[in-house]
Amino acid sequence: MVGNVLITGGASGLGRATATAVAKAGGRPLIVDLGEPDGGFDHVRADLADREQAERAVRELAERAGGLDAVVTAAGIDACGRLEDVPADRWERVIAVNLLGTAAVVRAALPYLHRSGGKVVTVASTLGVRAFGDATAYCASKFGVVGFTRALAAELAGQVGVTLLIPGGMRTAFFDDRPDRYKPGPDARLNQPEDVASAILFALGQPRGCEVRELVVCASTETSWP
């Protein structure tokens, strides 16, 4: 039983697939997203770039559900382009959502996770371990998530489970708003988000004291790994 699982970005992509998987496993998805999720799941709208909004959303959902058993930080945005071409506000928003938003959500959830002996799954990227040009904001944010999560795992050892998920490209709407030159080609091998969500459920399903520390889940021909 996975219990009450708070999922950021749960209205689309990997977050939505994870929410569906949690519900199918008998758990209760609790969604934080700017958009409204389908499926009738409990949700609070919040901009993760705003720390107070993020923290308030976590507390509201946790209190509504009577606690938290896990957190999955699946929300993420991008800003493709050369550093000098991407407006500074847009560049910094990627850091704010992907990295600072992750930290804000986990921080707010920790009192509940300490009580339940729960788990955290952060979502980084293969671009968090291998850098590419025209992706400075995204790489900086996801390299940050990798470092944050590894430090968090050391900090919370024996108290709260921590898993770092490093997914490759997935067939979601994440790429839709990019210029064509930054979109995967028509023959690109991308994972289905449902397959990555099943890996998250595997990590969440481990018994207390047994942890999946890191998971790399990507297509066998993923160009950003290794």
Residue ranges and their predicted role:
Residues 82-83, 90-92:
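Substrate-binding pocket helix/loop in short-chain dehydrogenase/reductase
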Residues 106, 141:
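Active-site helix of classical SDR
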Residues 11-12:
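Conserved glycine-rich cofactor-binding loop
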Residues 158, 164-165, 184-225:
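C-terminal helical subdomain
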Residues 46-56, 88:
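The beta1-alpha1 cofactor-binding region of Rossmann-like NAD(H)/NADP(H)-dependent oxidoreductases
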Residues 125:
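Residue(s) in the substrate-gating loop at a strand-loop-helix junction
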Residues 74-79:
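Conserved NAD(P)H cofactor-binding loop of Rossmann-fold oxidoreductase domains
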